[in-house]
Amino acid sequence: MRLRFWLLIWLLLGFISHQPTPVINSLAVYRHRETDFGVGVRDHPGQHGKTPSPQKLDNLIIIIIGFLRRDTFTILFCTSYLCVSFLKTIFWSRNGHDGSTDVQQRAWRSNRSRQKGLRSICMHTKKRVSSFRGNKIGLKDVITLRRHVETKVRAKIRKRKVTTKINRHDKINGKRKTARKQKMFQRAQELRRRAEDYHKCKIPPSARKPLCNWVRMAAAEHRHSSGLPCWPYLTAEALKNRMGRQPPPPTQQHSITDNSLSLKTPPECLLHPLPPSVDDNIKECPLAPLPPSVDDNLKEYLLVPLPPSPLPPSVDDNLKDCLFVPLPPSPLPPSVDDNLKTPPLATQEAEAEKPPKPKRWRVDEVEQSPKPKRRRADEVEQSPKPKRQREAEAQQLPKPKRRRLSKLRTRHCTQAWAIRINPWVEKKKKIKKQNKTHAPKTN
């Protein structure tokens, strides 16, 4: 009983701890390959990644059940095994390998034999960690990764909202584009799209027919005028086919005869003998007698005078007789201009009543006004200059008498103002007084 109890505890401790027993490891690998739920379930070091066969697993289970010999323990063991398998199936794997494909398993096994575990980056510590025992990527790192993603998404959404709000605010305040700039921008965009469509879209045959005809005629004219096989810018399908069939026109160099040498022929070509041609015997041909032809007797026909043939009767035979007879004058048909030679009487009277026009004098007949003669400086009468009177002859004005300050009215002025009194004002006052005294009194 004690042995069975300690065996059960040993199995449970091996399940909970990070060092599982070979039995549990083999069971886990057989049922759930490459998974560990909270435990470091991996192949036994002695197995080197090989999965035990189902026969070995069955033998181990039979040995355990036969060794325990109790139905209760067997039921408990099977129940715990099924629970562990169920939990491993539900929960995620910590090292990220759930055995979904054989390729991943092989890659992980080859990498495990080289590095003894997978290496990845922990989102919490930002360090590279491996799937060794005690240093696994756990649930905490998964939660941290999820929080990090959520924070990043929130920041992006907030940035988009702020940008939208700013753009809308600027558009309201008129900081984005004015109506004129917006119209010009839209026009430029439309022209750019039309240019792109022109290069991208194909012209339908219905719209291409008149273009082909015009292109064909223009290319033909260009070809005949310039001597080129075709116009390189006119590349319609019909024009290509037609121009491809026709031979190229003769150029200036090809139009020269073969026996004549061009000016552009290099001097080296003159030294080599030319190939034999049909024109080599052209000198012998004029010496040989020509065969008789119809034109040989042409000179004889020209020397023999032709017999006169009578002309047919014509209307002009009696023209000489008619010229000597004078023609009678033929009266002209009446017209409206016959009465314009003699003007009517009313017009003559109106012209007689008009005043005669003044006679226009010639330049020679007009009396020119005499020009004033230029006199010398001696002949000009000088205006008499005013005589300068002497100082003695000039009327001497009486000098104003100096009065004392005591006689001045010092009621409203000070001594300084009394000194600055103008003497000429006093003189004028004195003259006025004298005039009043000498003036006769009238009754």
UniProtKB/Swiss-Prot annotation:
Ranges annotated as biased composition (Basic and acidic residues): 351-393
Coiled-coil residues: none
Sorted UniProt keywords: Glycoprotein, Secreted, Signal
Entry-listed glycosylation sites: N111
GO cellular component: extracellular region
Cleavable signal peptide: 1-18
Main location: secreted
Polar residues bias (residue ranges): 252-262
Localization (cell): Secreted
Region (Disordered): 242-262, 330-413
Pfam families xrefs: NPIP
Biased composition (Basic residues): 399-412
InterPro entries reported for this sequence: NPIP, NPIP_N
Protein name in UniProt: Nuclear pore complex-interacting protein family member B15
